[in-house]
């Protein structure tokens, strides 16, 4: 189980799949996403179900990006990784919450 941002960064590689469990846009909850690119700035993902050609073509075909931000703006509970706008960590400041699938 992922317990901190460093572990998450090491775990996410191209091909890793994520299930969105919370999002600032309610329509994104339940999406299945696949990591396409990871760097020191953030992680790029494409939407798998149903594919969204507009979003998946963004950033030179890498999909949408979620910036890493500060470790203090993340929480890790019960296998769910959550990124927030700031350290407040409320439903109003949630950017995205997700579960890494087929986690070892």
Language model features by range: what are they?
Residues 1-14:
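Mixed-charge, Lys/Arg-rich low-complexity intrinsically disordered regions
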Residues 10-11, 34-37, 57, 73-74:
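Short, exposed beta-strand/loop patches in secreted or surface proteins that constitute
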Residues 27-39:
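Short beta-strand-centered aromatic/proline hotspots
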Residues 45-47:
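SH3/SH3-like beta-barrel fold
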Residues 50-104:
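Intrinsically disordered, low-complexity, charged/polar segments
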């Amino acid at each position: 189980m992922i317990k901190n941002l460093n572990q998450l960064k090491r775990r996410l590689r191209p091909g890793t799949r994520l299930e969105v469990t919370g999002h600032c846009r309610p329509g994104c909850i339940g999406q299945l996403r696949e990591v396409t690119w990871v760097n020191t700035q953030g992680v790029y993902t494409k939407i798998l179900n149903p594919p969204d050609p507009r979003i998946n073509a963004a950033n030179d075909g890498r999909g949408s990006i979620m910036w890493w931000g500060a470790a203090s703006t993340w929480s890790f509970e019960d296998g769910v990784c959550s990124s927030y706008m700031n350290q407040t960590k409320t439903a109003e400041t949630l950017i995205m919450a997700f579960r890494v699938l087929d986690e070892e």
